[in-house]
Regions:
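Conserved AMP-binding/adenylate-forming
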Residues: 265, 309, 313-443, 449-452, ...
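Conserved AMP-binding/adenylation subdomain of ANL enzymes
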Residues: 198-215, 222-315
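Conserved C-terminal "lid"/linker of ANL adenylate-forming enzymes
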Residues: 481-482, 498-499, 518-570
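Conserved AMP-binding/adenylate-forming core of the ANL superfamily
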Residues: 6, 23-73, 77-81, 98-103, ...
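AMP-binding/adenylate-forming catalytic core of the ANL superfamily
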Residues: 97, 114, 406, 411-412, ...
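Structural core segment of the AMP-binding/adenylate-forming
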Residues: 58, 85-157, 495, 505, ...
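Conserved pre-ATP/AMP-binding loop-to-beta segment of ANL
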Residues: 22-25, 160-179, 186, 209-215
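ANL superfamily adenylate-forming
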Residues: 33, 122-171, 279-320, 537
Length: 570
């Protein structure tokens, strides 16, 4: 086990890990029912160092920013390590964003190098504005033979001659720029340091140790803060094995558990719900006799493990279920969005512990995590080691804004000192989430103070980022809010977006307006669609630079309108 407190950078820690566990398997890449590749730590190192040398031959230098745009695959992790080895700054981008959104973030991050999958590169080159932000060097993976790469290099051919120069970095140096939100509005690039990552990793593995022989199933995109930490850094720094699955099809996820004897996996609530549905469907297809027996065994397991998990007992009582998950599954981690307590309880009753947590990119991923001592599905656990957590201005029920102080909290927002000063005050990160801290140390979330929603898939949606999609509607002016921001409620489920439609006093809205809004909605992914609109007859309050004062407008709406009667559903 490496002593991460003694390391100055991720590059240095990963370099030693690759040497210490050289013959252990570090990475398996699987796609549906076939295995694409398998790397030991030695082979992974042998693949990354020629790439690092090639980058340096192209002019890559210390602190150069490099964006990665790829689906889950081994080349993502190999590229990330090469960047850290060369002393660079990683910019992980979401491959599911539109090409226009990706270009906006590439421009904002000032990335000088880009490593990208071929189908994404083809779309990016066709997007308006591409010529204005093309990086100095582009490496394209998985390009077909003879494909026009537009001056880019083939990743597979980037094998420099000789050994690359290892570039040391310090704990306070930038390690990555991670975008915590969208794209159409004000980009929020979280600058995370090497210390942020090293301390976060130390905290997590103190509760759930990775080690050689542990097998972690990675299904979330590696650009996702959760998977980057527990699907790459955590396992690699401890000699464990990561299984990258390049599909989200439920049947292939289920098959991967027994095939690779998975120990841990991280999921977002949406994936957990899909797994629950699959299991309930299977249980429903059993004969009445077997269904009754199963209910009895589940009930017995629930009683015997009501205080804390007992894997040996659960695997004995519910052997068939645990064998379906490979027989070695210890825990599922769930985060990124609100998880229904009933779903967590469902898995716990089967003897499959689900450790839910709470975090945000600005805090280096995780802030709290359930240690399952005892199992508390109604909370998001206790603060991780090294994390201070307080409730700011609590009300009579003890509910207030959750604020965090830790070595894992980001350095700042990229090129946005105003937003940084509003978000980090006297060393405390203002999360914008409401919660209550119990005497036991468990955190209960109770809603949001900020104008945003989090989808079941773990995506942060900031309403102002969506307004461009509704430009041109027949309104004097409009803006979009999270309904729970306009009318705060003690809930994190059923979050919705509402469009505020500014009309002239007494003006009636024609039937064409909701039709137009519905048409615009259909062009958006489901998780970005507005659920309704409301009419507002007063001018929007604005700053001297004509920006909408959203907090003041929200307060005005809150005082004058009732949600149940004001919102017209689409």
């Amino acid at each position: 086990m490496l002593d991460l407190s003694q390391y100055p950078s991720l590059g240095a820690a990963l370099r030693d890990a690759l040497e210490q566990w050289s013959e252990e398997t570090c990475l398996i890449e699987a796609d549906r029912d076939r295995e694409n590749s398998r790397h030991t730590y030695r082979q992974f190192n042998a693949a990354a160092l020629p790439l690092a040398r090639s980058l340096q031959e192209m002019g890559f230098a210390e602190e150069h920013r490099t964006a990665i745009l790829m689906t889950n695959q081994s080349k993502w992790l190999i590229s990330a390590y090469a960047i850290f080895y060369c002393g660079g700054v990683l910019v992980p981008l979401d491959y599911k964003l539109s090409a226009a959104e990706q270009l906006a973030l590439l421009t904002h991050s000032k990335a000088r190098f880009l490593i990208i999958e071929y189908f994404l590169w083809r779309a990016l080159r066709s997007a308006p504005g591409f010529a204005d932000c093309k990086p100095e060097a582009v490496l394209v993976t998985e390009a077909p033979a003879g494909a026009d790469l537009g001056g880019a290099c083939r990743w597979e051919e980037c094998k420099g001659q000789g050994d690359p120069a290892f570039v040391p970095r310090s704990r306070k140096d930038w390690a990555s720029i991670v975008y915590s939100s969208g794209t159409g509005g004000r980009p929020k690039g979280c600058v995370l340091t090497h210390e942020n990552y090293l301390e976060q990793c130390r905290s997590l593995i103190s509760l759930y140790p990775f080690a050689p022989g542990v097998r972690y199933l990675s299904i979330l995109p590696t650009n996702h803060a959760i998977d980057f930490m527990v699907g790459f850094l955590g396992p690699f720094l401890c000699g464990a094995t990561v299984v990258h699955l390049r599909t989200l099809r439920p049947e292939f996820i289920r098959d991967a558990f027994p095939r690779y004897r998975i120990t841990y996996m991280s999921v977002v609530p949406m994936v957990l719900k899909n797994l629950e549905k699959g299991l309930r469907d299977r249980f429903g297809s059993l004969s009445p006799h077997r269904r009754f027996l199963l209910r009895c065994l589940i009930g017995l397991n629930r009683v015997l493990t009501r205080h804390r998990p007992n894997l040996k007992l659960s695997r004995l009582l519910l052997k068939d279920i645990h064998q379906a998950f490979g027989g070695e599954l210890c825990c599922l981690f769930v985060g990124g969005a609100f998880a229904e307590p009933a779903t967590l309880q469902f898995f716990y009753d089967l003897g499959i512990a689900v450790a839910n947590g709470y975090g945000l990119t600005e805090a280096g991923t995780a802030v709290t995590l359930n240690d399952l001592k005892p199992f508390r599905p109604d909370t998001v656990g206790k603060p991780l080691p090294g994390v201070e957590l307080r409730i700011l201005n609590p009300d009579a029920d003890g509910v207030g804004e959750v604020v965090v102080r830790s070595k894992t909290v980001m350095s700042h927002y990229l090129d946005d000192p105003e937003l940084t000063d509003d978000t980090i005050v006297d060393g405390w990160l203002l999360t914008g989430d409401l919660g209550r801290l119990e005497a036991s140390g468990h955190l209960q979330l109770a809603g949001r103070k900020k104008n945003m929603i989090v989808t079941e898939g773990g995506k942060n949606i900031y309403p102002e980022d969506l307004e461009a999609a509704f430009e041109g509607i027949p309104a004097k002016e409009f803006c979009i809010f999270a309904a729970n921001y306009l009318w705060p409620q003690r809930a994190l489920r059923g979050e919705q977006l509402v469009l505020v439609f500014h009309t002239e006093p007494g003006q009636k809205v024609s039937a064409a307006v909701p039709e137009e809004l519905a048409a615009r909605n259909r062009r958006l992914p489901d998780f970005k669609r507005i659920s309704g609109y409301l009419l507002w007859e007063e001018d929007f309050p604005r700053t001297a630079s004509m920006k909408i004062k959203r907090n003041i407008l929200a307060e005005q709406i809150r005082k004058k309108l009732d949600r149940s009667t004001a919102v017209h559903q689409l």
